[in-house]
């Protein structure tokens, strides 16, 4: 029997941020089904730990990325963690290393491990189709294989000599094709005829800093003509106080309902959402909800991103649909007045022109079907093939 197929199999993983923790947890489920007694270690979050993963460092230590000022300030710490992790992995070599997203941290580590003979897999293709196309060379050096969550990515990577497998998007399996709005509203204490706006200003402190206040200012403008509009804000505990402060600064402290977590319940219950660009926009699309996508950042970050942007869209629903199916308001365009007007369009359409909403829901349902696969099993199948060679 191939030694790599014998238990206990040892696999090292690195996941950054909550989204990486969720993706890795699904992957662990598939691995454990195929290899009982598998040993899993590295950098991970609470969902991974609940499934038997041994975290040497918590994933929140990596929770900065891109060209952010936070990353520049913390570069020494991140490089130190990566050096320690590399030494540990080379001293106690795993059968396989899997980097989950976090390309700024993982690709360099993967390259070093691969050069030393450790098989490497990168889960979630870096968005070379959106910006930073030069990164494709780094992916080719770093990963023996890439597990892709969007259907067009394997063919793109194949053009550059990179082996890849489409495993579907885990969120598409997690979210029902027909979300139960009535159940979600009942859970949140809402009436069937309530008009509900979900406000999601981001999952990182930097996003809250730039987006929360204009989002709440837009909500205040909406309430001037829609005084009964319900405003729901799902918030993870570490960001709750920042969100409360932003709401108070906009004079909306008593008018918004801040809910601990439950972003999926809020998206299922709402009529529309005002939302920060990121994975949450795909979640909103999978819940078939009209949205206004917005983003603001430090001017230096904005300048760097615009210089390397390859597509006219920023929001994932628009990128995947290849057109502006929902509006995007970015940087200086994301004013309270513009956010209010774009959101009002969707709220008015739901009550005054339902076919507009129906057409959007059909588009998002087709997108949902294209992303829905048995991700844990497909990923485990790909890893089995990699380990056997």
From Swiss-Prot:
**Pfam families for the chain:** LpxB (PF02684)
> Which SUPFAM superfamilies does the record associate with it?
UDP-Glycosyltransferase/glycogen phosphorylase (SSF53756)
Is Transferase found in the keyword set? yes
A GO BP term here is: lipid A biosynthetic process
Q: What is its EC number?
A: 2.4.1.182
* Enzymatic reactions: a lipid X + a UDP-2-N,3-O-bis[(3R)-3-hydroxyacyl]-alpha-D-glucosamine = a lipid A disaccharide + UDP + H(+)
Top-level EC class: transferase
List the InterPro entries.
Glyco_trans_19 (IPR003835)
Identify a single GO molecular function assigned to this protein.
Answer: phospholipid binding
Fetch the CDD domains from UniProt. Answer: Glycosyltransferase_GTB-type
Q: Which GO terms describe its cellular component?
A: membrane
Q: In which pathway does it act?
A: Bacterial outer membrane biogenesis; LPS lipid A biosynthesis
Q: Which UniProt keywords apply?
A: Glycosyltransferase, Lipid A biosynthesis, Lipid biosynthesis, Lipid metabolism, Transferase
**Residues annotated as signal peptide:** none
- UniProt-listed NCBIfam families: lpxB
What does it do? Condensation of UDP-2,3-diacylglucosamine and 2,3-diacylglucosamine-1-phosphate to form lipid A disaccharide, a precursor of lipid A, a phosphorylated glycolipid that anchors the lipopolysaccharide to the outer membrane of the cell.
Instruction: Tell me its family.
Output: Belongs to the LpxB family.
Question: What's the protein here called?
Answer: Lipid-A-disaccharide synthase
Q: Taxonomy-wise, where does this protein's organism fall, top ranks first?
A: Bacteria, Pseudomonadati, Pseudomonadota, Betaproteobacteria, Burkholderiales
């Amino acid at each position: 029997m191939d030694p790599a197929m014998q238990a206990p199999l040892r696999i090292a993983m690195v996941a950054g941020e909550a989204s990486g923790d969720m993706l890795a947890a699904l992957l662990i489920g598939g691995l454990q089904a195929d290899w009982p007694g598998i040993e899993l270690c590295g950098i991970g979050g609470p969902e991974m730990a609940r499934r038997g993963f041994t975290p040497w460092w918590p994933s929140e230590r990596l929770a900065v990325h891109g060209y952010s000022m936070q990353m520049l300030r913390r570069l020494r710490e991140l490089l130190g963690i990566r050096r320690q992790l590399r030494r540990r992995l080379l001293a106690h070599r795993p059968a396989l290393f899997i980097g989950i997203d976090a390309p700024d941290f993982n690709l360099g580590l993967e390259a070093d491990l691969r050069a030393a003979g450790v098989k490497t897999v990168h889960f979630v293709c870096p968005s070379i189709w959106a910006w930073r196309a030069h990164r494709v060379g780094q992916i080719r050096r770093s990963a023996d294989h890439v597990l892709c969550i969007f259907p067009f990515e394997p063919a793109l990577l194949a053009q550059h000599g990179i082996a890849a497998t489409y495993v579907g998007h885990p969120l598409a399996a997690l979210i029902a094709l027909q979300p139960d709005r009535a159940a979600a509203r009942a859970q949140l204490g809402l009436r069937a005829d309530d008009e509900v706006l979900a406000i999601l200003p981001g999952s990182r402190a930097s996003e809250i800093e730039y987006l929360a206040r204009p989002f709440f200012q837009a909500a205040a403008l909406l309430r001037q003509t829609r005084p009964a509009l319900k405003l729901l804000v799902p918030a993870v505990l570490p960001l709750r106080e920042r969100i409360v402060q932003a709401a108070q600064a906009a004079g909306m402290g008593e008018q918004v309902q801040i809910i601990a977590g439950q972003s999926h319940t809020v998206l299922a219950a709402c009529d529309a959402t005002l939302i920060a660009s990121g994975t949450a926009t795909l979640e909103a699309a999978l819940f078939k909800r009209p949205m206004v996508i917005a983003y603001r950042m430090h001017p230096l970050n904005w300048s760097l991103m615009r210089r390397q942007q390859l597509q006219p869209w920023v929001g994932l629903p628009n990128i995947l649909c290849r057109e502006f199916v929902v509006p995007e308001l970015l940087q200086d365009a994301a004013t309270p007045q513009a956010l209010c007007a774009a959101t009002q369009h969707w709220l008015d359409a739901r009550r005054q022109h339902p076919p507009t909403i129906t057409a959007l829901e059909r588009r998002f349902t087709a997108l949902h079907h294209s992303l829905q696969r048995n991700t844990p099993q497909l990923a485990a199948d790909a890893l089995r093939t990699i380990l056997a060679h």
